[in-house]
Amino acid sequence: MDKFRVQGRTRLSGEVTISGAKNAALPILFAALLAEDPVELQNVPKLKDIDTTIKLLSQLGVKIERDAASGSVFVDASGVDEFCAPYDLVKTMRASIWALGPLVARFGKGQVSLPGGCAIGARPVDLHITGLEQLSAEIKLEEGYVKASVNGRLKAAHIVMDKVSVGATVTIMSAATLAEGTTVIENAAREPEIVDTANFLNTLGAKITGAGTDRITIEGVARLGGGVYRVLPDRIETGTFLVAAAISGGKVVCRQTRPDTLDAVLAKLREAGADIEVGDDWISLDMHGKRPKAVTLRTAPHPGFPTDMQAQFSLLNLVAEGTGVITETIFENRFMHVPELIRMGAHAEIESNTVICYGVEQLSGAQVMATDLRASASLVLAGCIADGVTIVDRIYHIDRGYEGIEDKLRALGAKIERVKGE
């Protein structure tokens, strides 16, 4: 397995170009199963999860090609002839459940192995299943597979979601585009990636309104065609590089990003003492050589503070002036990076879904292990500012969600190299 070797005590400064959002590109790729004509997706990041999705869609009979130079992916789902997403691909990535809604909506049948992915607590697929059942799909759980079928077209429904779920909102919204009648989703997720998926589907001819609010309306259509669509920039990658500069007293400019998707994160960075400026598609952060101040925050569904930035802000608090408290309300078991940071000299206490961070002036390099995608990013950033050398193991997690992170960090002055596994 590959590792990162990071030499620390670096002030990270410079410019970084932000990639397309993984959390938008994945649902959009699966939603392309609904299109009867070819689709071109631009600004698709080069990531392990994207590669897995392309492989999975190919197995279903989708003709799919990536232009490495431009970052575009060309999808032709006119010849889909297989309706089962098998365990060997699904086990590494729980986003595969997003194949189910489009398959049953367009072809009347689909089955997906129960998913895998990051080991951060229980992320059940129940909300996906109940949503599809309300759209009149018949669901069976057999031999580790979720099997969905319907006679004729799905039927529209008024769906009130038990809890806010990005994944289930995507599933229901995608499937409802081809249902008979008008579907309303109440208590829908409001994330920018939901809006991006809805905008993509509308480009193909869907009739979706209200995405970005808690009430989405989908007027079903008979078919979806093709089109060209550009995936929005990755707000979590943007936030990660802003934190990299903030914890090292540095200065960074993030290009080709969307400041309007990061209000909660920018507010907390300003509270930590960062000098921040924004334009239409750029954000600059300057710490003027100072240590950040500790902040207190709670993760929450959008437009609240994103859970995917929690690990990076845990690190910020652990090297900040003062004491900060972080409460994780979205996922259980999402503080697995904290014991690793304690190995590097951090001082923290975990109580249930809260971590109390007592800032220290300096971390020390150590051998640490990545446990999930965002935790691994925080460990790499910790290595950049720690005294000595840090080895980050199991970095396959980071390759799932950050495109060329070592190259981008090197451009900011980091001393980081990938050590190939045996």
UniProtKB/Swiss-Prot annotation:
UniProt-annotated binding residues for phosphoenolpyruvate: 22-23
GO molecular function: UDP-N-acetylglucosamine 1-carboxyvinyltransferase activity
Compartments, record wording: Cytoplasm
InterPro entries: Enolpyruvate_Tfrase_dom, Enolpyruvate_Tfrase_sf, MurA_subfamily, RNA3'P_cycl/enolpyr_Trfase_a/b, UDP_GlcNAc_COvinyl_MurA
EC category name: transferase
Pfam short name (any one): EPSP_synthase
Residue(s) carrying 2-(S-cysteinyl)pyruvic acid O-phosphothioketal: 118
CDD domains: UdpNAET (cd01555)
Pathway: Cell wall biogenesis; peptidoglycan biosynthesis
GO CC list: cytoplasm
EC number of this enzyme: 2.5.1.7
One GO biological process term: cell division
Keywords of this entry: Cell cycle, Cell division, Cell shape, Cell wall biogenesis/degradation, Cytoplasm, Peptidoglycan synthesis, Pyruvate, Transferase
Enzymatic reactions: phosphoenolpyruvate + UDP-N-acetyl-alpha-D-glucosamine = UDP-N-acetyl-3-O-(1-carboxyvinyl)-alpha-D-glucosamine + phosphate
Positions that bind UDP-N-acetyl-alpha-D-glucosamine: 94, 123-127, 163-166, 308, 330
Protein family: Belongs to the EPSP synthase family. MurA subfamily.
Protein role: Cell wall formation. Adds enolpyruvyl to UDP-N-acetylglucosamine.
Official protein name in the record: UDP-N-acetylglucosamine 1-carboxyvinyltransferase
Organism of provenance: Yersinia enterocolitica serotype O:8 / biotype 1B (strain NCTC 13174 / 8081)
